[in-house]
Curated annotation (Swiss-Prot):
Entry annotated with the keyword rRNA-binding: no
InterPro entries, sorted: F-box_dom (IPR001810)
Alphabetic keyword roster: Ubl conjugation pathway
Organism expressing this protein natively: Caenorhabditis elegans
Lineage top rank: taxon: Eukaryota
CDD domains on file: F-box_SF (cd09917)
Residues covered by the F-box domain: 12-60
Lineage of producing organism: Eukaryota, Metazoa, Ecdysozoa, Nematoda, Chromadorea
Disulfide bond keyword on record: no
Any Pfam family: F-box
Name of the protein: Uncharacterized F-box protein C05B5.5
């Protein structure tokens, strides 16, 4: 008959007092989610885990949107651990509450509710940074909304300050007045000043002027070594056809390699005679084989202009509307080499 270890003052096993060699052996049988849960049992166990970090993080994704707060760790063995704090908008009686999901190979799905989801998000993120090896990790994707300005500055300074980011997206879907636009661009500048090198930057704002309403999206591509600080021109501009003509001429003359994609969609048609005035273009067909981004118009879509560039050419696609129906695209090629 086997013997059983009962939990008494004399016989209980104190995990913390075990030698580090035993700790490391135990950790070999635990996955990241189990390590995370174990770290929350006591401060002493948390310290033990800090001294024996087993899992190295390869990529980190962060999202601080209006309705979702999320961080995701991808480890060197391709295991993914993610936490999501999101607004349960599909259940009206939970509108002000958030749920979190922590997943390890889709095996775990836990739900809790928090009065302060931002504090819960920060607590979980700080804890994950401390117990896993993030020294050589990359910040792969970072999605930010200007309304989360205070949350951004509460992120661990040692993690954010000077850290390189491969893909940074900042958007504001409510920038429909001058104050909102000013706030959004100042937020973008504040983020870029704290970050290190940003490889790809995507800025998206809904804008309106006296004569027009439009979505504005601009994407930059940066080198590995330079700071990326875009100007304010695209945000404060009303983007009539003359402005777009000036933009294209400036790009052709100065060959700014940072601008890779520029798209606006407005509740109007674009006059290509004005937009391309003084610019030599070649009619282009996507079947000619250039690998570029294409935007598919829908029946309810508005007019749009897409500028897509690389080092030696650019393509401009102008979409037209006829009532509520899309009339398709005209495509123009600029050869710059």
């Amino acid at each position: 008959m086997g013997q059983y270890l009962t939990k008494t003052e004399e016989s209980s096993l104190n995990y913390v007092d075990l030698p580090d060699t035993v700790h490391r052996k135990i950790f070999e049988y635990l996955n990241p989610w189990e390590i995370f849960k174990l770290s929350r049992i006591s401060k002493a166990i948390h310290v033990t885990i800090l001294k024996n970090k087993k899992f190295a993080v390869k990529d980190i994704d962060l999202c601080t949107d209006e309705n979702i707060l999320k961080f995701q760790f991808q480890f060197v063995n391709n295991i993914v651990l993610s936490w999501e704090f999101y607004n349960l908008h599909e259940k009206p009686y939970f509108t002000s509450q958030f749920s979190n999901r922590c997943q390890y190979r889709q095996q775990y799905d836990i739900k809790n509710y928090y009065e302060n989801p931002e504090e819960a998000f920060l607590f979980a993120f700080r804890n994950a940074l401390s117990i896993f090896n993030v020294q050589n990790s990359k910040l792969k994707r970072f999605y930010l909304a200007p309304s989360k300005l205070e949350l951004f500055f509460k992120l661990p300074y040692s993690f954010i300050d000077g850290r390189n980011c491969e893909n940074l997206s900042i958007w504001n879907k409510k920038a429909n007045d001058e104050d909102e636009r000013d706030f959004s661009i100042n937020f973008a500048k504040a983020v870029l000043e704290k970050m290190g090198v940003v490889r790809n930057l995507r800025l998206l704002f809904n804008c309106s002027t006296k004569d027009n309403e439009f979505d504005c999206e601009k994407e930059y591509y940066n080198s590995e070594t330079d700071k990326l600080m875009p100007n304010d021109w695209y945000l404060y501009n009303k983007f009539d056809d003359i402005d777009l003509n000036v933009f294209l001429k400036n790009w052709l003359n100065f060959r700014d390699p940072l601008i890779r994609k520029f798209r606006i969609r407005g509740k109007r048609n674009f006059n290509t005679a004005i937009i391309f005035d003084g610019i030599e273009t070649i009619p282009w067909d996507q079947r000619n084989g250039l690998n570029v981004y294409y935007y598919s118009a829908t029946a309810n879509d508005t007019g749009s202009l897409i500028f897509q560039a690389n080092e030696n050419h650019a393509i401009v696609k102008v979409g037209a509307i006829n009532g509520n129906e899309s009339s398709g695209y005209m495509e123009f090629l600029f050869i710059t080499f």
